[in-house]
A protein has these predicted regions:
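Bacterial lipoprotein signal-peptidase II cleavage site
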Residues: 5-6, 21-47
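Active-site- and interface-proximal helix/loop "cap" or "latch" segments in soluble metabolic
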Residues: 51-60, 66-180, 190-304
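Sec-dependent bacterial lipoprotein signal peptides
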Residues: 1-21
Length: 304
């Protein structure tokens, strides 16, 4: 999967806020064998100068997520501690059936580094560091070169932990990562509007395959961003693409590729593509568990 890095621009045109909303608000059990790590650390300082303007506060406690299946002999274990409403420590690891971390697998480290120039000792530490730096701003977590799928999986799970912390639900999240998707319709919706729009997203699974993907951005009247001709024209002037093009393209790509990790990032709509993949990953996890309850995301919105 091609992944471009999100660049927070210094655009001063009045259009910038409008265009950035196409890059949305803030994925994946689908990861390649490059996923591995053991990293635990305390948050030293706050992420960026961006100010949170919407989204639920985090409730104090320790929140955990575990994969239930072993992939290439390892499964993810992840935890996040919140104190005084702030993330104070994070832990992310891949363990084998004996509880041994993949970071201690010297053969794996050597083989992966030879192929993609980054091994679990490096990218796990970097992902954890980025989580510490950016806190609840999951969209700002770095995608590590050579470990793209692992990075997107990390972001998906970090997002789920943040949602749990907003709800104060300390029950361990279990991800049936090696399970088949069960038939049904799975739905996710954002609660908060960013530049006048919020995400609505559903996938339909039949015979274990995604047959429909309905991702959209709607305003308070329920009108799709694809129908906003002014927005379309303004965004196309700057990014050469608008919601009328990138929204159906993302939906089409998910049905064709059957995996969020394989969805192509639409040039000019990188942030929206990343958000799409993040939420698609969460919907796939729901389908693997057969949980058709609507996922309500009290999405955290930052000022531009």
């Amino acid at each position: 999967m091609k992944l471009s890095k999100v660049v927070t621009g210094t655009a001063v045109v009045a259009l910038s806020a409008l265009v950035l909303s196409a890059c949305g608000s803030s994925s994946s059990s689908s990861k390649n064998s490059t996923s591995s790590k053991a990293s635990s650390s305390k948050v030293v300082k706050k992420s960026s100068s961006q100010k949170q303007v919407a989204g639920g506060a985090l409730k104090d406690g320790t929140y955990k997520l575990d994969e239930t299946g072993y992939d290439h002999g390892y499964k993810v274990q992840m935890a996040m501690t919140v104190k005084d409403g702030k993330i104070t420590s994070t832990k992310y690891d891949y363990v084998d059936k004996d509880g041994k971390s993949k970071t201690k697998d010297a053969a794996y480290e050597k083989a992966m580094k030879a192929k993609v120039k980054a091994g679990p000792k490096e990218y796990i530490r970097e992902l954890n560091k980025s989580f510490q730096k950016n806190g609840t701003n999951v969209g700002a977590i770095d995608v590590i070169s050579g470990a793209t799928d692992s990075s997107m999986t990390f972001k998906n799970y970090a997002q789920q932990l943040i949602q749990a912390a907003q709800a104060g639900d300390t029950k361990t999240i279990e991800v049936n990562n090696t399970g088949k998707m069960q038939d049904g319709t799975y739905t996710l919706e954002e609660k908060n509007y960013f530049n006048g729009y919020r995400v609505t997203f559903s996938i339909t699974v039949k015979d274990g395959k995604i047959t429909e993907s309905n991702y959209d951005n709607i305003n308070k009247d329920g009108k799709s961003k694809t129908l906003d001709t002014k927005y379309e024209a303004n965004m196309k002037k700057v990014n050469k693409v608008g919601p009328k093009e990138y929204i159906p393209e993302l939906n089409k790509s998910l049905v064709a590729k059957q995996s969020p990790a394989k969805v192509d990032v639409v040039s000019g709509a990188t942030h929206s593509s990343d958000t799409f993949i993040l939420y698609a990953d969460q919907l796939v996890n729901a389908a693997q568990n057969g949980n058709t309850n609507k996922i309500e995301v009290d999405n955290i919105v930052y000022n531009n």
